[in-house]
């Protein structure tokens, strides 16, 4: 090649192909070596600088990546993707204004760059500008209809919005989010979707008036109209509805259908409505209150179906579905014999096949020692009766991350950074329930191996079924009491126990066992009930004790109905909780057999006794409110300041204190 100028020299096409191949296949060491070689020989070759910046970012060398990315932009200021990449690095460094400027420049240069629109939406969300964020994500989705990250970001953002106007254009995107992928837990999305649906003309005219259908004609008209509202149907299939107006409607419709079942024609619209209602009631674990008259009619319906099966006659689909909206089909010994559900694949699969799968899984779960502690035995019994919680879909990260990336994202204040050098962490989830927690953890940390334990075999079977369904292979389940976990003879890099220790007889005894299992400088994620946030719940628990309310499903539902009908403020406050709307979550909320509550000064003492250092709370919204409360630069790791804040804002930790700590 004739040398005209250094600027015109180019690396070979083979070098560029290899560079791209190394990066795309995760061979970052090779990619770094080759990109460094190219940039040294051809210092003005912008593509090599761009790849080098991406490689350095992947390796966690973010500051070096910034310098290289700026060089890439300098060499070609018209490269929209280079500006977008620079914005990503700025965002990771917390330089949000500069990140926003980079994304906007990328969009200016290339308006159809979907990634830049999505990234801009993330910045808008960080600034609390949720409507603008959602608009950016929608633009990204319109440009790239299969853009998984944009759907996930849209779902995460919109769950915080409460709508004041109708917006039918959002329906297809929301339906996609509910039906495709595991972007966000549907139960977290439900309040936002319901607030949107309340402004839909169909809902306004049909559902939210004082009197619902009182006769067959009105009921058929409503069912026919609602068949057009596919978003509502998709929602009720996958989660409880945390809204008493919608609950009242479905309770009344269910009762009306049961009372007039023989008079309803099995139209496609009717079967569709009844199918989704049965899925909904199964998912909320039959939390809806039923009157004595309904109980009698259900008993008659059970007998009718049983007699038909005994005569080798097949019951109509509408009768099976009506029963399924009140009772669990898999508990009937005739459930495998019915043919009426053969064409209703999802109903048959979820209401019969999946529970049978779980029964088989129970026999396969390893058991670590006997559960002999009396309180642990009672807690286990509760969760065997009501595995917590029942769920269909889950919110999973689009990509697993290194410990260093997670520490940065959570803004953890570490005593030792050596934990960030662990590439393939061993993780323990102590108290995994039905698998949402353990599956989320196994999907969050790259190259991790997770051991998940729980007291309840029913919960573990549910968790294992969902884990297999999702194709997750780095997760093992074990029945065990936390008090017996020292028998594992294993140490862990990370231990997570959220919503568990406060249900033990002696929480510190369990916490000490977990601390002993944690490697030096290991991380622990803990969730504990707040004394201040649960004052009203504590009052209701006292009422339950004084009134000697039982813990049967009928007793629990009857007491729940009394809360709905009560005018007491602290009763009404409970009805605003999403935990109010399914049986296992409601039972866990106020009927739990064992509950301790903590204050932040108590937690500080516990951490000191255990040799753990507080590294930070998890909830970014609470942290933001904490900063606003003090109106100045403030130490977000000072538990004394947090206690002062909570005393002034007692409902801040209404869920739990969820925080990270590190073993000293």
Give short role names for the model-derived ranges:
Residues 1-423, 439-442, 490, 519:
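Alpha-helical solenoid repeat scaffolds of the TPR/TPR-like class and their adjacent stem/linker regions
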Residues 180, 229, 559-664:
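Rossmann-like AdoMet/SAM-dependent catalytic core
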Residues 434-447:
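Conserved SAM-binding loop of SAM-dependent methyltransferases across substrates and taxa
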Residues 471-483:
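Conserved SAM-binding strand-loop segment of SAM-dependent methyltransferases
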Residues 485-495:
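A short acidic, Gly/Pro-enriched loop at the edge of an enzyme's catalytic core
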Residues 493-507, 530:
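A short SAM/SAH-binding and catalytic strip from SAM-dependent methyltransferases
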Residues 508-520:
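A short glycine-rich, Lys/Arg-flanked "PGG" loop and its adjoining helix->strand segment in the class I
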Residues 523-572:
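Conserved class I S-adenosyl-L-methionine
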